[in-house]
């Protein structure tokens, strides 16, 4: 029952950030293309917006998420303890912020694609998936905290791969231009 509630909580907390970002990806790539000469600098404003929205969303999920979750998806008889574990304010807030970290990695991936760094893009996603899956199965912790850590740390690792890769590629291009 906890797993089902957790899957529902993950789905609900990812949608408000990821669905608009999916629609925005073409615009993001276009903006990064216009600033190819300084991709990391062009990344800062949209990244700050994603983090700010994620932080505000996490706070809102922490404060009112459990109430709304129970209102929209009332627990079945005997499933109340699963809701305490997977739909608490701290869990919903953490899941929302983890989705903002995934959005940040998605945005950094768009930047990598815009500057023609397809291998960096792929490497970031492969690293994120590998880290997420590894942590999800290997952390010796209960399901909910293990899922939160895996869903947050995996995208951060992919984001770091994207950012370091694009920064190094930009420096290499600058050195060749001189």
Whereabouts are the PLM-identified features?
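Membrane-interface helix-loop junctions in multi-pass transport and translocation proteins
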Residues: 4, 65-66, 70, 83-89, ...
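Helix-loop junctions and terminal segments of transmembrane helices
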Residues: 9, 13-37, 113-114
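Alpha-helical transmembrane segments of multi-pass membrane proteins
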Residues: 13, 77-108, 122-123, 130, ...
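Membrane-interface junctions at transmembrane-helix termini in multi-pass inner-membrane proteins
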Residues: 31-34, 40, 97-124
């Amino acid at each position: 029952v906890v797993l089902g509630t957790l899957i529902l909580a993950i789905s609900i907390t990812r949608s408000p950030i990821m669905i608009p970002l999916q629609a925005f990806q073409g615009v993001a790539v276009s903006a990064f293309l216009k600033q190819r000469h300084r991709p990391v600098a062009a990344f800062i404003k949209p990244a700050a917006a994603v983090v700010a929205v994620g932080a505000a969303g996490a706070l809102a999920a922490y404060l009112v998420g459990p109430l709304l979750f129970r209102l929209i998806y009332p627990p079945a008889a005997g499933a109340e303890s699963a809701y305490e574990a997977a739909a608490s304010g701290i869990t919903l807030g953490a899941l929302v912020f983890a989705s903002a970290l995934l959005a940040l990695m998605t945005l950094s991936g768009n930047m990598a694609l815009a500057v023609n760094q397809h291998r960096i893009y792929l490497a970031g996603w492969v690293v994120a998936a590998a880290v997420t899956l590894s942590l999800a199965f290997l952390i010796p912790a209960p399901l909910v905290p293990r899922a939160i850590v895996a869903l947050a740390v995996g995208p951060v690792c992919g984001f770091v791969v994207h950012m370091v890769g694009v920064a190094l590629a930009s420096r290499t291009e600058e050195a060749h231009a001189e």
